[in-house]
């Protein structure tokens, strides 16, 4: 083997070792070589042997020696590493004093989707970066309007685990009502809150005129008595609320004396976990403010639609003499072409569509479709903390996913709309087909004999000459594929299309489900090579010249159903 080829192998062996803590990998090195010099694939066996030899040598060096070799012989590879580091997307630095504590507070009234997963990923990532704590807090204190779904607690936890998110503490707000009552008593006793007995319409009219409710000046003692009557069920729903005293001259009416707690008729609207145990429930802003303080949250990352909520909650913090957490708010994140509204997704799910329907932008739907968790995280980190709304096209999502799958997914042969042909070859041929182009040493063998029936796509059959991948070159003649030659060089000279094929007597029936958010799910029937039979449910592979698919179901009769991810 020439010196320039040995130098090429040595260069990539050094670079791979230096970027992986001093240990190079033969397969990774060979993959880089074939990517740069594809013509060397014909000498794969020799290349692999040289790679093994030089990788062993490089791995015997310490990291500092590897770096010196790169600096002296291949300095451009160090520059490449520097560029890779600079191009890696990271979250911006934030001010931290002491132990950083973040939280993710989903309402378990539906599944997570790409948009609301953003707060979870960013909050967890900052906790990881700064060696802090991450809290999962279920915001489930509205059993009427945003009623929690019992299954949603587990849906959310399953999605977070899939994303690689681990929480240090799990909290359910509905289990903390006594805590909220105690803080309400403090606010009432200090005159910062009051019990409003006005009708809602009457209060709204007064608020619009910036006029005080007649109950605003009720004594703390009387308010505390009324509050005890509220929590003991002596007031019907809509008859009494606890309001925080703010500024009636504030320009935003919603911030004027907003509601801390209200009566909810849990006989009609029982909580899925607490049932009808509690009669008085905190609003989102009251429960969030109390929990963020009580649980020691120092940093909050959330959508900019919560900006008004922050202003409301600061009133409580100021009254109590607490320091408000550091807050960063970001814009909405949408997946183009998909319904992103939680309420709309919930409506669809309630009609019997599973949360993992591959047409939905739910994390469960994307997962079932073959989108990797690392892809979701990379997209979120790349968008970062931008305050402007962002829309991600599915093509962009697929592009990121493809780069990751390309490195790991097996390449297998599937034929849609198959057409039968008898192969006319002079003698048996043993095809050795690599599972992945980066590793020619791992392959499956398919033995083809003269007269075997071969299945190819009906559109491919329209060409006069073809190359059956890793088998031979053929001429299409009626219902026969007539042997032309064996080598790939002949195919290149004649510009032959290189196609996938399946041997009929070893074929596996395959159903491809191709989801479209608007058109529904298209079903494509075809056949696959025998290796598809050995795939596990949930495994993602690439069907050659077709796209990436994820195994969804394996039937007792041998049929394999897959979901099309993307090209």
Curated annotation (Swiss-Prot):
InterPro entries in UniProt: Gln/Glu-tRNA_Ligase (IPR050132), Glu-tRNA-synth_arc/euk (IPR004526), Glu/Gln-tRNA-synth (IPR000924), Glu/Gln-tRNA-synth_Ib_cat-dom (IPR020058), Glu/Gln-tRNA-synth_Ib_codon-bd (IPR020059), Rbsml_bL25/Gln-tRNA_synth_N (IPR020056), Ribosomal_bL25/Gln-tRNA_synth (IPR011035), Rossmann-like_a/b/a_fold (IPR014729)
E.C. number(s) listed in UniProt: 6.1.1.17
Positions occupied by motif 'HIGH' region: 106-116
Keyword Cytoplasm assigned: yes
GO cellular component, one term: cytosol
Keywords, comma-separated and alphabetical: Aminoacyl-tRNA synthetase, ATP-binding, Cytoplasm, Ligase, Nucleotide-binding, Protein biosynthesis
Reactions this protein catalyses: tRNA(Glu) + L-glutamate + ATP = L-glutamyl-tRNA(Glu) + AMP + diphosphate
Location relative to the cell: Cytoplasm
Gene Ontology biological process terms in this record: amide biosynthetic process; glutamyl-tRNA aminoacylation
Record-level Gene Ontology MF annotations: ATP binding; glutamate-tRNA ligase activity
Pfam families, sorted: tRNA-synt_1c, tRNA-synt_1c_C, tRNA-synt_1c_C2
NCBIfam families per UniProt: gltX_arch, PRK04156.1
Family: Belongs to the class-I aminoacyl-tRNA synthetase family. Glutamate--tRNA ligase type 2 subfamily.
Function: Catalyzes the attachment of glutamate to tRNA(Glu) in a two-step reaction: glutamate is first activated by ATP to form Glu-AMP and then transferred to the acceptor end of tRNA(Glu).
PANTHER family: GLUTAMATE--TRNA LIGASE (PTHR43097:SF5), GLUTAMINE-TRNA LIGASE (PTHR43097)
The name this protein goes by in its record: Glutamate--tRNA ligase
Organism annotation: Sulfolobus acidocaldarius (strain ATCC 33909 / DSM 639 / JCM 8929 / NBRC 15157 / NCIMB 11770)
Lineage of origin: Archaea, Thermoproteota, Thermoprotei, Sulfolobales, Sulfolobaceae
